[in-house]
Amino acid sequence: MFDILVYLFENYYTPQACPAADVLAKRLAAAGFEHEDIDDALGWLYGLAETTERCVDLAQAPSSGIRIYTDSEYQQLGTESIGFIAFLESAGVLPAPLREIVIDRALAAPETPVSLAKTKIIALMVLWSQEAEIDNLVLEELLDDDGARRLH
């Protein structure tokens, strides 16, 4: 599923550039993706659209509150992902309403806990869905697969 999300980001400049779900499913199948993964990705994207629609008016509202995670959220997200979400928020990349969308979509992911690499893809897709301008350094970090980093 996550490979499909990255494929969509790389091939469609905005969500509006994506074709209708049935056409998109055919294109993804032609690109070699499995039908089960396509269904999962389309379902996940549908959930993203629903969540975004509910939160769109809140996206511009300033927030100075601190997010407290429930035990189940903490187990599903894991320490690394929660830390990364906090990093994006403190860097001004992820306003509080978009943070909530990232958390919602991470909780909808099939793995527990959600790996840091998958959390980065989720954050990328949430920002993409909002057509947010993403700084190049942030984009690099979001697309980094967390492989071994070379120290200089």
UniProtKB/Swiss-Prot annotation:
> Which top-level group of life is the source organism from?
Bacteria
Q: What residues form the membrane-spanning segments?
A: none
What InterPro entries has UniProt attached to this entry?
Smg
Q: Name one Pfam family in it.
A: DUF494
The family this protein is said to belong to: Belongs to the Smg family.
User: Which HAMAP family does UniProt cross-reference here?
Assistant: Smg
Q: What is this protein called?
A: Protein Smg homolog
